[in-house]
């Protein structure tokens, strides 16, 4: 995969590297890549922040590349409060789930469209659920919400459990972690006004993502929970 030509990109994460450089995880339509940004204390370092539309060129054939050029390509998406933690959550999902240098133009486009909506104060939960669902689908982990694992239509009054590698399985007895058929059908229609639909979608996405996150907790989620629990002045 060649990254020599200029590419639209976003910074997912950056950390200091050696004396004046930074090690940066970028997300482009051609995939996720890691590169050394030299002179990170100067203008380039000021640009290399999450949620800022950028254009970049890279050098190098190995997994670790070098940033050859980095320029602003649009208005920064200024995220604050819960929107900021949500943006960090999306970035962490991309770092944890995307294979390196695997082209994902659809995910990139969805990400680029989601950031301005977060910055504009749009309701956060529907945005996160839509992004999680698109990510699962594009990576080949998606499943149907309107039919069960045997191809039968989801029944509104029935109960279902998620088998992450297969789909939704009907169950006869009540147990933890189940989903009402009516909730699943609301998710299929993206009808977030239906009672319980958003809460059920959050549980469903957690169950669907968990096998692919390797058992390690999400740092962004822990940061958000710590913020909620911190006493306020």
From Swiss-Prot:
Any Pfam family: RecO_C
UniProt key word DNA damage: yes
InterPro entries from the UniProt entry: ARFGAP/RecO (IPR037278), DNA_rep/recomb_RecO_N (IPR022572), NA-bd_OB-fold (IPR012340), RecO (IPR003717), RecO_C (IPR042242)
GO biological process: DNA recombination; double-strand break repair
Keyword field: DNA damage, DNA recombination, DNA repair
CC per GO annotation: bacterial nucleoid
Signal peptide positions (record): none
Transmembrane segments: none
Keyword DNA repair included in the entry's annotation: yes
Main function: Involved in DNA repair and RecF pathway recombination.
Family of this protein: Belongs to the RecO family.
Protein name: DNA repair protein RecO
Protein source organism: Pseudomonas aeruginosa (strain UCBPP-PA14)
Gene of this entry: recO
